[in-house]
Amino acid sequence: MRELTVVEVRLDDEEGSPVLILKEVEGERQLAIWMSAAGAAGILGALQDADADHPSSHERMIALIASVGAEVSVAHIGGHQEGVFYAELIVDGRPVNARPSDAIAVALRAGVPIKVAEAVLDAVGVV
């Protein structure tokens, strides 16, 4: 697995859809994940710590997990097929399926790493 960091969230020039750009922490490859406007807003909110007076659904998810004595340790992008990325949150060592946008927003808010399977980065990562 390789650790990633968020480079930017922007609109795709051709389609006008939000796209998240992630980059290897130790390397040059980047990963582009297209997503809904709501998914992009969740990530932007986490990056900007927006609206701290009103917890986001991602903050509520982290609080709920903590309330049962568990914690999120990593967001993992583990697969890619036909343009669709598959992700999960690792909660107390157990995988919990999640949309990539949600997994990344939770990771940003929880301060945990975002990681990707080497095979995914090999298949769709670009320099």
What does each model-identified segment do?
Residues 1-127:
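Divalent-cation
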